[in-house]
Amino acid sequence: MITGLIILSVLACMLGGCATVSVNVHNGSDTTAPDADNTELIVFAAASMTETLEEIKTVYEQKNPNVSVTFNFDSSGTLKTQIEEGAECDMFISAAPKQMNQLDITADKEANPDELDYIDPDTRIDLLENKVVLAVPEGNPANVTTFAVMAGDLLEQKILLAMGNEDVPVGQYTQKILKFYDLDEAKLAGEGLITYGSNVKEVTTQVSEGAADCGVIYSTDAYSAHLKAVDTATEDMCGRVLYPAAVLKGSAHPDEAKAFLEFLQGKESREIFEKVGFTCLK
């Protein structure tokens, strides 16, 4: 009987010790949680900025250890919709003024018919300018050499063109180019001569993999994907490709967001943007 009691006591002590260890481990994990003083900035940015902003983030976080930057990269139209639907966001960088205007209460009624009021207009700037280019797969097997050649080959049903959807800025620029050459997009699509991507990265991938004979993308994406750009669209063909940026009125960290926007206009950021082909406007 005594032996049985001793065994039970030892077991109880062992279990008690295990419980203590469990609590200590749990408490220890709490100490590794993010610092309460750390600020997380959430930036919604056009997919074409992925490589440059990730590089800038590394530099910025080294200089500002109490700030972490989280990006949401997608088409500007998708990002604009997510902001409308209440997604948490501190800053928006669009690949075209259209989507920014739709969130700017100071924009005219035609540009913002729903009178949406999401961005702080006092922080809005035109940050960058890009170029729209005609890119081809390695070796250019279809021998598409200019936009004019592309237009002629489409009319002759000789090639497959990759372009962005109509709600994507790069797709909207492409639509303007097709109109410039008096091409009927709906007819071409119906004939199976156009393949679409939901953002510029998808279009770029289609060209890189040779799934299309050519594609209309940004100069910076062609550079990042090591694709040959055989022609560059003029302003007459598709207008200027501007990237506006602004802090949101609903930002949880407006001061930190403004500081990051200021950094995007600084020397270190400019060097990163310009080496891939962006033109810095500020």
Task: Label every model-predicted segment.
Residues 7-10, 24:
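Intrinsically disordered and other compositionally biased segments
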Residues 1-5:
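Bacterial N-terminal signal peptides that target proteins for export
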Residues 18-63, 72, 77, 81-84, ...:
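Exported/periplasmic ABC-transporter solute-binding proteins
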Residues 90-94:
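Periplasmic-binding protein-like
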Residues 13-17:
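C-terminal motif of bacterial Sec signal peptides marking the signal peptidase cleavage site
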